[in-house]
Amino acid sequence: MTREVIIRKARKKDIPLIAELWKELMDFNKQYDGHWSRSENGHQSCADFINDHIADDASCILVAEADNHIVGYCLSDICKCDPQLLKVKEYGQISNLAVTKNYRRKGIGERLLRKTVNWFSKKGIYRVEVCVGISNKSARKFWTKVGFTPFVENMFLEI
């Protein structure tokens, strides 16, 4: 059962499907930390965010499509640094990269990432960051496998 998977820029009509995949991603992530529990209307906020950024030159929203179904997506942006503090003026931020359960471990995530990194490179961005849950071993393994290196650890205190 090999299906051709196409990686392409997201279109407005893809937004509800991406929002559904976002729900799947968040439900997957909450098993590692309850902090990732989504709100009841979180998917609508996600859809609104994507709608606001889909045509933005500083955003790259890609989808993986198989048999006319969206099976993965990657949401990324160019972020600005304070030029008075850091030599690096801009960097790439990957907010989400998700592949639906039945299509995982088939190289789709890596293909989405490669195309995203290529987009950043064409924009003159040479550093890309991603936030990974510390207890999500499968995500940490994926990001390490594709060349990412830990550089900061965020900590929290519940009061």
Predicted regions and their residues:
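Conserved N-terminal entry element of GNAT/NAT acetyltransferase domains
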Residues: 1-16, 24
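Conserved GNAT-fold acetyl-CoA-binding loop/helix
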Residues: 27-49
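A short helix-loop-beta-strand connector motif used in the catalytic cores of GNAT acetyltransferases and
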Residues: 49-62, 93
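Conserved beta-strand in the GNAT
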Residues: 63, 69-78, 93, 98
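A conserved beta-turn-beta hairpin within the catalytic core of GNAT-like acetyltransferases
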Residues: 80-94, 104, 126, 150-152
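Conserved acetyl-CoA-binding loop-helix of GNAT-fold acetyltransferases
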Residues: 96-99, 105-118, 145
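Conserved active-site alpha-helix within GNAT-family acetyltransferase domains
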Residues: 110, 122, 134-152
